[in-house]
Amino acid sequence: MKKKTLKRIDLLLLVIVILLTTVLVYRISNKEKLSDAYLASDTSNVFVYDEDDKEVSLVRGQLVSLSDKTKEMNGNEYHKVYLGGTVYYVYKDNIVLDRESSVLEKSLYVYRTCSVYEDKEGSKLAGLIERGEKINVVGHGPLKDDGSVDRYQFDGGYILSKYLTNDKELLNISNPFSNDTSNPYGAGSASELDYIGNEKVQVEGNVMPDVCKSLYINREAMEDIEDYIELAKRTAVNTFVIDIRDAHIVSYKSDIMKERSISSYDAAAFTMEEFKAQLDKVKDAGIYMVGRITVFKDKNFMIDHPEFAIADLNDDGKPFMYGGSYWPSPFVREVWEYNVELAKEAVIKLGFNEIEFDYVRFPEQIDYYADKLNALDLQNKYNETRSQAIQRFLMYAVDELHSVGAYVSADVFGETSNNYVTAYGQYWPAISSVVDVISPMPYPDHFNTHAYNIEEVVWEVPYKLLLAWGKEAKKMQDITPNRARVRTFIQGYNSISRPYVVYDNEKLLDQINGLADAGILDNGYIVWNAGSYIDNYCLYEDALSR
């Protein structure tokens, strides 16, 4: 009896052991195995499902814990993943094993003609690519936390993602000026320019005043900057437009100049440290700082790099001299790079809020010398129109300067209030759609004596003149998509044409009121006095206080 009982116990124990072993083997064999993986997609977001089978959007490039468990959904296999303690189910093609591979775009379309970069980072250019072209993606720039990338690589270099799309339908967006084929001065038709425009940004930590009441400050004035700061404190002035480079007049010894234009570096009045010390006083006073750079009029740079100049074919191909200066060609990308790097340095090292590009144009009468006389080599490598070169430079400059937290403004002639492309390549809508601020220069003494059929000499009646001019400028601004703000130059000096007129406080106020009544004052004004004479500016204290 005892032996039978023991046998039963042994048998029972054996059964228990077998059952426990079976359970253990089952558990071991069914234990969830986890490994690192990344969410991947051909857009910045990945669509996945949660445990309730609801569709959820997650940012691509995120690290997840990939389970060896799968789930059948809609006839497809989905992998179980863990992200932040939450379970999701991801389609197998949206899982990769390294973060760089999480960008799945294979081909994209160029929907705005744009610059091509040499590298995944930096401002060095490799060429140009036209709207409508299809690229095969072979790489990309750094993947950002929001799942986007700034640049895509193809066999010709890198393109900013903002100029690319996977939606071919976007190529059918019509040009609002497509019926305009006028080309009166040979600088290109309005219909050949880009009006998709840059979305206007609010740079974090860099607040542009709603109305900029501005004084122009040249290199010499920086020596006594305290006087101008005191004037600003007594008035409503809140912005200084400060020279970085004015043609051959250079303010400070820039490291970029030392590297790329030693003649410019040697011509500088201040060291960078000295100049920054003066700028710090401006910043400490709460004044918005705009750095002015003359772009395509630069004698010193042409001395160092004649190969980038507009060439005079009547003078053995030497740099073309016009208006007392040599002119870098707006078609040459090395010129673009130099000026943009100079601007970025000014923002990063000196703290400018905004860069204002002046002389962002070809020389006056370029149509006569280049088109009629065939006397110039403009070095037009990409067969662009003059207006395309100007607009595309500004597109490049805006992209680069926005990346370092600065705004961009461009100076244009008062002539741009007319609805045609000027000979020197400026067309109001093409520029206003790209930059943050457009700054026209309708100086009264630069107009024809009886412009707009005004009976009086127009610089004797600046209110009437700028009211008439402003109404025309507003028409151009109103037809511009994605338009910039308008900050207009006004005349802060006595007229240089007969009859000579003293421009006193009343005349300054007349200009401001004319612009305001025309509805074009918008982002304020800049008082232009080439000498930046403090005595002249003090004469306007009443007008500047309003």
Where are these regions (language model features)?
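SH3/SH3-like (including bacterial SH3b) beta-barrel domains
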Residues: 48-60, 118-131
